[in-house]
Amino acid sequence: MVSLPILYSFRRCPYAIRARLALLHSNSIVELREVVLRDRPLSLLEYSPKGTVPVLVLPNGEILEESMDIMLWCIGEEMLIGDWQELVELNDNEFKVNLDRYKYPDRFDDAASMEFHRNKCLEILNSFNQRLDGGFMMGNGLTIADLILVPFVRQFANTDRDWFEQQDIPNVKRWMNGILQSELFISSMTKYKQWQDDDDLAYFPK
C-alpha cells in the first residue's frame, strides 16, 4: 500500500479545521491522528517540537507545520489566483489577535476591554460583509479564501451567539451558515477518538 501523508489534528482548532477543509477540497486522503493538546503524543513532538497542530508529515519525510503550508500543498495552483494573501494577513494577524483577546481576555496581559476587541473584529466583519455581495470572498464561488477565513468567523460567532445574531452583517451570516451547513464542512468536523502512538490507522476523510 502506498504511504499516505499523516495529519496531526485537533477537531476544534480553527487552523486544523482549515487544513482539513483544504484536504477535502483537493480530494486528498491522509492518515489522521487526533490530538488532545494536554496529552500530546510523543511522535508529534518528535516531528514538530513546538507541539501545535496541524502538522502534516509527507511520505518523503517533509514536515509541514503551518496550516497555510498544508493548504498550499493541497491546492497550490488555486492559491496563485486572486488577492487571498491580503485576507490571510488580515485574518491571521489583526482579526485573530483581537478574537483571542475577546474570547480569552484573562490570558493576555496586553488585552484591552472585551468590548474593544470584539468591536475590532466587527470592523473587519463589516468589511467582509461588503466583500460578500457576490456570495463568496472572491466572487460567486467557493475558493481557498473562504476556507481560510470561515473557521475563525465561526469561532467569533460562537463566542457570544446572541450578540453576533444582533449585528447587521447579513452577508457574513449567510456566507458562514451556508458553508457550515455544507457537506464539505460537516465532513471536516467528523469526530475521531484521541490517537495514541500504538493505535491502528485512521483515515481522513472516513
Predicted regions and their residues:
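Extended, well-ordered alpha-helical scaffold segments
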Residues: 116-120, 124, 167-181
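GST-like domain detector, emphasizing the conserved glutathione-binding G-site
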Residues: 1-129, 134
